Amino acid sequence: LWLRPTEKFDFQDVIMRSEPASKKVSGILVPLFALRGARDFGVGDTEAMRDLIDWSASHNIGLIQLLPLNETGSDHSPYNAISSVALEPLTIALNACDVPGLTESDIAEEQRHFGWPFRRCNRVAYEVVKPFKRAVLRRAFTRFKTDAQDEATTAEFEGWIARESEWLTAYVRFRAIMELSQGDERWSLWPMEFQTLKGFDRYFEGLAQDEKFGWMAEWEFLSWVQWVAHRQWARVRAYADGKGVSLMGDIPFGVNYYSADVFECPDRFDLTWSGGAPPEPAFQDDVFVKRWGQNWGVPLYDDAFQESEDFAWWRRRVRKNREIFHSFRMDHILGIYRIYGFPWRPEMNSRFASASDEAVQSECGGRLPRFHPRPDDTDSEKQLNREHGERFLRVLLEESGKGGLVGEDLGTVPDYVRPSLLSHGVPGFRIPYWELEWDTRLTPADAYDECGVATYATHDHDPLRVMWDRWMATIAKGESGLHADAEARDRAWWEVRRLANWAGFEVPCIKPFEDVHLLLVRALLRLPCRVVIFMITDLFGTAQRFNVPGAVADSNWSARIETPVSEWDRDPSLKAFLSEVHHDLARVHARSSGR
C-alpha cells in the first residue's frame, strides 16, 4: 500500500493520481529546531536533517514536512520571518566539511566564551544560540577571506552572489542595519534614511569611501552566511533525492511587517492593515484570540501593485522554496481568496482585547477587523473572492508545477474554497475531528477524497496524547458529585466515543493513551487520502507542543525532542510500535489488492 523510499516515488505523481490508485505516501511533520543531532549546538540543523532522512528512509516514511526555514528576527516564529528568501543561519551545521574556513578551534573557543550547555537544554535558548553561531560563522568567514581558498570555491561564492542579487542586495542592507541597531528589525525605529532600500541607497552614495568599505565588508559576510546556508540545504535536497525521501516546505501567506521585503519595496504591501484570522472555536485559551481572532502582524498585499508586476515577488518566493523542497504547504491558503485584517498592529492587542466595537472604531478611524478584499456575505461577493483567489492560485501553480502545492485550508473555510482547490488539483488538509457531518458526527473515512493530506494535528494543535489524557482526566473528575464536573465528564465521553467510533474501536471505560495510540494511527493510515502525515509527537505518542496561537512565551517555537535522531531506534518500545504499524499496513494492502 505504501510507497517505499527505495521505490523512488514522486510526490507529485502520487498526489496527482499518476501512480496506481493503491499507492500512498506516509510522512512526518517535524519542526527542524526540535531535532537533536549527534553534534548540534542547541538547535536542529542540516546534520540533524540528514539523520532524519536516514531514519525516515529506514522506516518507509516517504515524506518529511518542515516548518518555514526563513530567517527570523526577535520573534522566533518561523511564520514571521524577516525575509521571504534568506535562510535561518541557525540551521547551518557547524562542521568543517560544510562551512568553508571553519575549524574545530573556532567552535571550541566560542563554546568556552559562551559557557553554555548547548546539547543538554530541553528548549532552544535563542538568546544564546543565535549569537554563538553568529560568532563561530564570523570566525570562519574571516579565515575564508584571509586563507587561500581553492579557486573553485571562491568562484562558486562569487557566482552565487551574482545570481542571487535580485533579493540578496536588499536583504544584506536590511540585515546590516539590523546589526547596527543591536539586532532590532523594527525599521520604523531606525533613522528615516534607513527605513527603505531607496532611502538607504541615497544615504550610502553620500558616504566617504572608507565608510562605504565598512558597509560592504558586512554585506559580504552576510552574503557568505546565506551562501553557506543555501549550499548546505542544496546538499540536503540531493541527499533526500538519493534516499528517495520527499521534502515538503512551508510558505506562509504573509511576511513580517519588519522584513527585508517591506524594506525593499513597501509599495507591494498595504501597511495600514495587519493580517490574521478570525475567532475560531479551536482557539479559546487566549482572551484576545477568543474575542478578535489571531493578529499575526503581517501586512496585507497591494493587489494592484502585485498584479502590475505579474506577481514577480510571489514567483520568486515559490521558485526559491522549490530549490530546496519537492513540494510546499501554502500556509493559510484561505488568504489568497480573502484575508482577515486588523486596523492595528499586534503591539496594540492587549489594549483592544476587551474593548467594545465602538471603542475600537473611535481609535481606529471608524474601522473594525474585517475580511479583505471583501467579506463572503452574499453569493456575488463569494464569487468575486473565488475569482480573486484563483488568479493568485494560477500563479502559484505556474511556479510550483504539478503536485508541488498543498493548501492549508483549515479554520473557518468558505464553502467555495475546497471545490476551487480541487478543481485545480490542489490537495488540502483533513483533520478528522474537524471534518463534520450535519449531525456533528465525524465524516466517515470512506467519504474522504483521495486528493487530500490527512493528519491529526499541525504545529498549532494539542498532540493526540494531550487531548486524550485531558478527556480521561475530565471523565475521572466527573465522579466528584459536582454538577459542573458531571457535565464536563459527559461532554468528554461524547468526544471520546465520537472519535473512537470514527476510528473503529470502542471505549467502554477509562483507557490510558497507550491502549488506543496504535488504533488511532491505523485509522488515519487507512483513509483514502493519498498522503498521510503525522506530527512527530503523534507518531511517538509524546505530549510536547510547539506553538500555542496567541501566546507570547519562551515555550513557543523552542521545545526540543529529548533524544537525538540517531538514537531513536534504540528505544525498544518505539521500535516495536513502528514495526506493528507497518505490519498492519501490509495486511491492509493485501486485503485491498485482493491478494
Listing of model-derived features with the role each one plays in the protein:
Residues F9-N60:
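Mature N-terminal, pre-catalytic/accessory segment of carbohydrate-active enzymes
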Residues R17-K24, L29, A38, D75-H230, ...:
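Alpha-amylase-like alpha-glycosidases and glucanotransferases acting on alpha-linked glucans and related
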Residues A229-G242, S246:
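Active-site pocket-lining segments that scaffold enzyme catalytic pockets across diverse folds
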Residues G541-R595:
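Structured C-terminal cap/extension of enzyme domains
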Residues I61-P68, A240, S246-P252, N321-I336:
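Short acidic catalytic loops
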